[in-house]
């Protein structure tokens, strides 16, 4: 492998001399042109309690580059006396409607105060656009409709941040998390809470919204979702446990099976938000190279096979498959739109525990498995060096590669988007991420890269060790 390529970076939002700061990016690709929508929080200072309102820049992709419009303030995305935070857009492909979810938090109440007191100050809000983000409708407060009585057991909650997804069934999903009140003491003055990921969903193209069940066991927070072939949903979440948490849903996010730690995806100190996006792998790339599977134990999957569990487990991916589909044939559709992405079936450990039983036909030979990309700071002690990770078997927590660092320096929150195949290139992706030279909240940057770039630049061995925690700048957790 030659010198590592670093994609060209464009700064879309930059901290101003007045102290005005831009944080918490979200990115959405709107076909067919496509149009890119880059969202962010505008804050009076870097502090969470000084969040103010949401802003947007629209970009048009032409001939491999993006032409960006000027910054606009989303004037309708606000509740009176509340601050708007955590942009989380999702597109309904059937109607072309964009739903921008966010939370509106009363005054300057910090999240930490809500967690300590058990007194929620957040509202679940949404605005919509039917013209690719040019105009936005009035705000909807969905708190009572979507959460209802469950809110009394939530110390606080938030959506995303980053993009939501739409499943093949049409269900719209918005990733979220809550600090659930486990118990109260001293007449309710002391509150014991634990964070849990979840999803809000709609089955009627956004007319009504509902709250799904929590990831039940491990502490999990800010998360993103990806569809899994076989009608499963994959959740990847921030955690204070030292590694990311993944969890599966067999009912499209209505509930989640117990989560499990992903040992190959380390968290920074106190954790950091990360982004995932799923896509169909190109059939021309052979899966035999152990370099891309993350483990020499991994063996290629047939795109159409029956799964037989050889070893029992009550949790995670293996437990899900054991309970719901011990001998279910899984086949990939031969034609799917670029916006409907799935994940390849797999296990939570050694793939030798899965036995292929369905002979591959000439048609199935043309079908490709699906992969995941994941973006997150590569530093383990601080938020440094934005990395792109690849998994060719997403349900296997050992399948992730080491990161390809696309930006050296302080880095924070990010959001990925899949743009599809482009002329003269392989599959193309975009990343919107917090960056800076001394702190991770100086800029929000944008870059484009292809799957070929990822395959060429992902490290294969221990070459990340010298970079991961190289001192550079000051990165404050949040």
Swiss-Prot record:
It is a peripheral membrane protein. Residues 285-307, 335-359 are annotated as: Disordered. The active site is at residues 47-48, 413, 434. Highly expressed in brain, particularly in hippocampus, and at lower levels in liver and spleen. Expressed in hippocampal neurons (at protein level). A motif (FRIP motif) lies at residues 22-25. InterPro entries: Sialidase, Sialidase_fam, Sialidase_sf. Substrate binds at residues 23, 43, 177, 179, 222, 238, 383. Induction: Down-regulated upon neuron differentiation. BNR repeats lie at residues 127-138, 200-211, 247-258. The keyword tRNA processing does not apply. Disulfide bonds: none annotated. Its main location: membrane. It is found in: Cell membrane; Endoplasmic reticulum membrane; Microsome membrane; Mitochondrion inner membrane. It catalyses: Hydrolysis of alpha-(2->3)-, alpha-(2->6)-, alpha-(2->8)- glycosidic linkages of terminal sialic acid residues in oligosaccharides, glycoproteins, glycolipids, colominic acid and synthetic substrates; a ganglioside GM3 + H2O = a beta-D-galactosyl-(1->4)-beta-D-glucosyl-(1<->1)-ceramide + N-acetylneuraminate; a ganglioside GM3 (d18:1(4E)) + H2O = a beta-D-Gal-(1->4)-beta-D-Glc-(1<->1)-Cer(d18:1(4E)) + N-acetylneuraminate; a ganglioside GM2 + H2O = a ganglioside GA2 + N-acetylneuraminate. GO terms for cellular component: endoplasmic reticulum membrane; lysosomal lumen; lysosome; mitochondrial inner membrane; mitochondrial outer membrane; mitochondrion; neuron projection; organelle inner membrane. GO terms for biological process: ganglioside catabolic process; glycoprotein catabolic process; negative regulation of neuron projection development; oligosaccharide catabolic process. It comes from the Eukaryota. It is an enzyme of class 3 (hydrolase). Its EC number is 3.2.1.18. Keywords: Carbohydrate metabolism, Cell membrane, Cell projection, Endoplasmic reticulum, Glycosidase, Hydrolase, Lipid degradation, Lipid metabolism, Lysosome, Membrane, Microsome, Mitochondrion, Mitochondrion inner membrane, Mitochondrion outer membrane, Repeat. Belongs to the glycosyl hydrolase 33 family. PANTHER family: SIALIDASE, SIALIDASE-4. Exo-alpha-sialidase that catalyzes the hydrolytic cleavage of the terminal sialic acid (N-acetylneuraminic acid, Neu5Ac) of a glycan moiety in the catabolism of glycolipids, glycoproteins and oligosacharides. Efficiently hydrolyzes gangliosides including alpha-(2->3)-sialylated GD1a and GM3 and alpha-(2->8)-sialylated GD3. Hydrolyzes poly-alpha-(2->8)-sialylated neural cell adhesion molecule NCAM1 likely at growth cones, suppressing neurite outgrowth in hippocampal neurons. This is Sialidase-4. It comes from Mus musculus. The gene is Neu4.
């Amino acid at each position: 492998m030659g010198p590592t390529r670093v994609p060209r970076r464009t700064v879309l939002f930059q901290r101003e001399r007045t102290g005005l700061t831009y944080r918490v990016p979200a990115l959405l690709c709107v076909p067919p042109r496509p149009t890119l929508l880059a969202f962010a929080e505008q804050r009076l200072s870097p502090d969470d309690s000084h969040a103010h309102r949401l802003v947007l820049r629209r970009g048009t992709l032409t001939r491999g580059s993006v032409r960006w419009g000027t910054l606009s303030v989303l004037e309708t995305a606000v509740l009176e006396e509340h601050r708007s935070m955590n942009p989380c857009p999702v597109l309904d492909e059937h109607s072309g409607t964009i739903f921008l979810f966010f939370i509106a938090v009363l005054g300057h109440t910090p999240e930490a105060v809500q967690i300590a007191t058990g007194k929620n100050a957040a509202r679940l809000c949404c605005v919509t656009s039917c013209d690719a983000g040019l105009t936005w409708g009035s705000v909807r407060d969905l708190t009572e409709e979507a959460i209802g009585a469950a809110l009394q057991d939530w110390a606080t909650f938030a959506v995303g941040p980053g993009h939501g997804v739409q499943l093949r069934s049409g269900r719209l999903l918005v990733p979220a998390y809550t600090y659930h009140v486990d118990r109260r003491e001293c007449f309710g003055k002391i509150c014991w809470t634990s964070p849990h990921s979840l999803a809000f969903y709609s089955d009627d193209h956004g007319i009504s919204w509902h709250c799904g069940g929590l990831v039940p066991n491990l502490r999990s927070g800010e998360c993103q979702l990806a569809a899994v072939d076989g009608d499963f949903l994959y959740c990847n979440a921030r955690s204070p446990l030292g590694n990311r948490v993944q969890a599966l849903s067999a009912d499209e996010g209505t509930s989640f099976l117990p989560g499990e730690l992903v040992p190959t995806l380390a968290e920074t100190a106190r954790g950091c938000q990360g982004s995932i996006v799923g896509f169909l792998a190109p059939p021309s790339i052979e899966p035999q190279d152990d370099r891309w599977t993350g483990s020499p134990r991994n063996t290629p999957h047939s795109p159409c096979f029956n799964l037989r569990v050889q070893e029992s487990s009550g949790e995670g991916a293996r437990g899900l498959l054991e309970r719901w589909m011990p001998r279910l044939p899984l086949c990939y559709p031969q034609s799917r739109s670029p916006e409907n992405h799935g994940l390849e079936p797999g296990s939570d450990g050694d793939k030798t525990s899965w036995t292929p039983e369905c002979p591959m036909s000439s048609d199935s030979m043309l079908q490709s498995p699906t992969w995941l990309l994941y973006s997150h700071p590569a530093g383990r002690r601080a938020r440094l060096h934005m990395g792109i990770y690849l998994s060719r078997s997403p349900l296997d927590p050992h399948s992730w590669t080491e990161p390809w660092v696309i930006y050296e320096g302080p880095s924070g929150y990010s959001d990925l988007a899949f743009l599809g195949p482009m002329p003269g290139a392989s599959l193309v992706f975009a990343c919107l991420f917090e960056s800076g030279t001394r702190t991770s909240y100086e800029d929000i940057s944008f870059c484009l890269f292809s799957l070929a770039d990822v395959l060429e630049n992902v490290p294969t061995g221990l070459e990340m060790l010298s970079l991961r925690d190289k001192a550079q700048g000051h990165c404050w957790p949040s």
